[in-house]
């Protein structure tokens, strides 16, 4: 199985995770779901539970709120869905981590991967300008991260209202 990188972008509740799951599920199982969310609040715990229930038994879940590079290295042969880069970035920001270093580590892991990977990320640059400096910094860093991932991806898909639009490559 060769490496093929897909980036799936979209707004909140756009259907991007479901679309990404479908891309991975079209490949032979088993599949690996790399989760970057942490259930720090009841609402997030409910969202995580809903995602798990939707996936089924062919999925193995790896929790990787920050060390995504190490998680990808553990998945040598199974197709991988990473959901999502947006939470991964915010986790690093809240930990006051070196974002450039962590992004470079992620890029190295993607380069070394030998299996198909689907990355999920929010497209946050189309909304209003955040009024708080941290919000603006997050929006800017997410935009740069999305650009870097899109540059290396074989395929980039934007999902709006559950409908995929190919930005790079084909559906």
Residue positions per predicted region:
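Flexible, compositionally biased loop and terminal segments
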Residues: 3-9, 34, 86, 105-107, ...
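Structural motif
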Residues: 7, 79-81, 118-120
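Residue-level signal for inorganic ion chemistry
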Residues: 20, 51, 81, 122, ...
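Structured helix-beta-strand junction loops
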Residues: 27, 57-58, 78, 113, ...
């Amino acid at each position: 199985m060769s490496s093929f990188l897909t980036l799936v972008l979209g707004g909140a509740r756009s259907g991007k995770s479901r679309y990404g799951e479908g891309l991975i599920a079209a490949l032979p199982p088993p599949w690996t779901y790399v989760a970057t969310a942490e259930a720090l609040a009841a609402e997030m715990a409910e969202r995580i539970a809903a995602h798990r229930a939707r996936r089924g038994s062919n999925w193995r879940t790896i929790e990787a709120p920050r060390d995504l590079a190490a998680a990808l290295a553990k998945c040598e042969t199974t197709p991988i869905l990473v959901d999502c880069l947006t939470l991964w970035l915010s986790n690093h920001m809240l930990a006051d981590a070196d974002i450039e270093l962590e992004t470079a580590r992620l890029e190295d892991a993607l380069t070394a991967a030998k299996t198909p990977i689907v990355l999920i990320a929010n497209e946050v640059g189309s909304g209003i300008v955040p009024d708080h400096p941290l919000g603006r910094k997050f929006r800017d860093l997410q935009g740069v991260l999305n650009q870097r991932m899109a540059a290396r991806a074989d395929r980039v898909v934007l999902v709006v209202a559950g409908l995929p639009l190919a930005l790079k490559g084909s559906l």
